């Protein structure tokens, strides 16, 4: 009887490894580059997230660009500042508003803010976002693999057969390290491992294109004249008294939107359907066990394909606290009614009984 066992991050956490997004990855990212982390947090994550699936669901879906424009707005606010030019009472020019005005305009013109240059100065780090996350993941998984080498798992609680096949969504070597009877040829690391391949992560293209606030022209809610949360709204004196044209600000706003669209599109996860199909197509699977996986919508295409290949298989999934989130994620999927939800202890009992 063929068994397919699908492992998520909960499998590593079950074995006591430091692979939590909030508790383990976030501190590493902050240590790597705290400024970039805070910027990305403001761009994509309105509030703290706990799960890796939440991270993938949000990455590439811009919430606000205020944090990108604030350095430029600060410079503009101090660009044309008459108060800074005011003459002291002892000066013969004290109270000469028009002279102060002209001095302020001259000073502003001499120190004119070049919008694109300032944006590049403050935000060039965004060009390395994917590598930033990859490096954080590699460091976290390296720590987890080192922990694997040090731990003594005399009581593993899980029985795997030599004939079991595995799909691991993890980047660690936990499965083959702790369960040496599992052949590496029976494992598909669908998103890579830190030892062998580039780590794969990201969001679905339809999430990024269809729900990126009002920043994307392919979004039906996009309105070029009303790009919420990203325009620099300029006081009229910047245009009247310094040689700025409204078109310069309009062009800057459009360039920022285009840049962010490009950045967001780079966050699309390349779904490895062909790779998974090649791994599975010659197997005869009767039972499917899903352990430690929250069934994030980003990864549902894999499960739809698994259902197509093995429509008669029984499905079981482990539930840590509540099944509500999983049920919401797989709502209206092909396999929605196939899944049987079991608390972790009951799930492992069933898995071991069918060993």
For the regions a language model picked out, list residue spans one by one:
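SIR2/sirtuin-family catalytic core signature
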Residues: 1-15, 263, 270-355
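An N-terminal structural lobe/cap that precedes and organizes the functional/catalytic core
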Residues: 1-39
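Hydrophobic/aromatic-lined pockets within catalytic cores
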Residues: 15, 30-33, 176-183, 195, ...
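Glycine-rich, phosphate-binding/catalytic loops in enzymes
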Residues: 21-25, 183-186, 306-308
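Short amphipathic alpha-helical segments and helix-helix/interface helices
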Residues: 26, 151-159, 176, 276-280, ...
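Short, conserved aromatic-histidine micro-motifs
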Residues: 30-43, 315-324
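Extended, H/D-rich, highly charged conserved domains that either
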Residues: 39-254
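Short, flexible loop segments at the rims of nucleotide/cofactor-binding pockets, characterized by
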Residues: 138-149, 262-269, 293-295
